[in-house]
Amino acid sequence: MRSGNLCVRARAIAHAFTVCRGAAPGVTRPFGAGCVPAARRGEAAGETKSGQAIKRETMGKAKKHAGLAVLLAVLLAGCQSGPQRRPQTVIDGFAQGGTYHIVLVGDSTSGGLKGQLDSLLWRVDNSMSLYNPTSRLSRINRGETDTLDRFIANCIRTADTISRESGGRYDITIKPLTAAYGFTGDRPVQQPNVDSLLQFIGYDKIRIDGCRLVKKHPSVQIDLNSIAQGATADYVARWLDSLGWKDYLVEVGGEIFARGHNAKGGLWRVGIDKPIEGNVIPGAQLQVRIGISNRGLATSGKYRKFYTDSLGRKIVHTFDARTGAPVISNLLSATVVARTAAQADAYGTLCMVMGLNESIRFLESRPDLEAYLVWSDDRGNYRTYMTPGMESLVLQ
């Protein structure tokens, strides 16, 4: 945790990566009343990964390093000419296999926050991580427990709403597919028998009964990677709200919630990366900068999270739960601004599943969502689509 000469630090980071360019929340429903607390210390032994899992996590976390782009965008925005009107403090660290960054604006004391924050993030990770074999979600998937904590319960409720809105295009029960294709640290199957897996996939195959998860079949498994980091940003934001912070930015693995205003009294500035293969350094090549406040933001794309199998096929991480097949489309990335970061995270994934035209039709029916889509035309040229509200957020 630091305060003081943030401009010097920002420029040092930017130089190291040869770039000088940047990148009441709450979950959709309240915390599950009466549910047991999230995993406590001693309940989970921490993450243990095989070499294959480490390789998959490094390759598969498409947004884990996006925090650097966000941090640079925030810090460098404060390095422009003119006085910095209010002090700000930066807290950063590691969580969920990636990084987190928090910027707090104001004079309120921030002593001891990092320790409390790391404790919160530890509890979330030991709840929802698929890479941690002792997490609550991992044990639920193995059938060792059916008891939900508030983190998993809230994600399931939010996901269920979006699954119903999308006719099942978005679905968190795709764990058998993501595992078969090697996106959850499991060893990929060269030619998965998709038909045999589809019988265990479907949002209607799970329901919450009190604090228990009821499955229609023991082999039904959940993958929260499309919503967990956004939900984590929301949890941190709610915690900061409870402490009285009015102006802050929370970023977890690239998913963002911004409250109030930055140190200069303006919107929080966030950079969106160009969705080109090889663009592995967040902030090195920006598509656009936008300003947000009191909203969540997330970007989904297929330009980082993929692998080439032994047959030379590019396998992307986005699946259509109805067919079980990886999605093939000309939509390269989808950035969504929503009421919460969890919603933005999930709706961004939904757009990638639906593709360009269906996403546009869906967004036109949803005035509560703003989006910035990047797609490729038949000649390979990059094109963009923005909702009317997103156009007003773009910074010139």
Task: Describe the function of each predicted region.
Residues 74-76:
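Hydrophobic core
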